[in-house]
Amino acid sequence: MTKIKICGITRAQDALEAALAGADALGFNFSRKSPRRIDAETARSIIAGLPPLVTPVGVFVEQSPEEINDICRHCGLLVAQLHSDDYDAEKTLQIKGVRVIRVFRPSPGFEVSQVRKFTEKTGCRSFLFDAYSPAMAGGTGQSIEAQTAGSLFDETRDFSWALLAGGLKPENVGDAVTLIRPWGVDTASGVESGPGIKDALKIRQFVEAVRKADRSLTNCC
């Protein structure tokens, strides 16, 4: 089944709604520039109340590896999502005690070989492909062009677990799963009524759209 990550959690009630709807992972954004920014104490409190088998993921843009390690340990995060090109192989290897998801935002001239080289240097095999925007690291609601996304996943499938992000919402995530077949999907703005405020109905619709696509793939293959 396609894994589902609901990102930009800022409230305990939203975290619980997402977990009950069937989300596999929840994202907590620590970027100082994000409208979905959460502080460490609030994140820690929410994570402590999560049901078992729901994975808490920290999203980092500006923090140093040392800061990431401290925040992950304090909050009980299990995964660090590195959402900036500043996190090169050297910095990634300094992150300890958690799994790493490295984000790539394909811009003009991007080559898949960059992803493979990153794996060779770090051993990291978990990636997230998000739409490129010079103004914001993520959560823009913009989508990766379909042909580009298809090529990315086809060319990285043999050595990675990759999630698709960027503009996904209940109305289009089913088609994305069917056409691209990512290992997982990630959404923030696609299930919100406002930045950082999740819409419980949209979350349930998003999860059901993914599961419906999963069933169609199972039945056709």
UniProtKB/Swiss-Prot annotation:
It is an enzyme of class 5 (isomerase). Pfam families: PRAI. Pathway: Amino-acid biosynthesis; L-tryptophan biosynthesis; L-tryptophan from chorismate: step 3/5. InterPro entries: Aldolase_TIM, PRAI_dom, RibuloseP-bd_barrel, TrpF_fam. GO terms for molecular function: phosphoribosylanthranilate isomerase activity. Its EC number is 5.3.1.24. Belongs to the TrpF family. This is N-(5'-phosphoribosyl)anthranilate isomerase. It comes from Chlorobaculum tepidum (strain ATCC 49652 / DSM 12025 / NBRC 103806 / TLS). The lineage of its organism: Bacteria, Pseudomonadati, Chlorobiota, Chlorobiia, Chlorobiales. The gene is trpF.
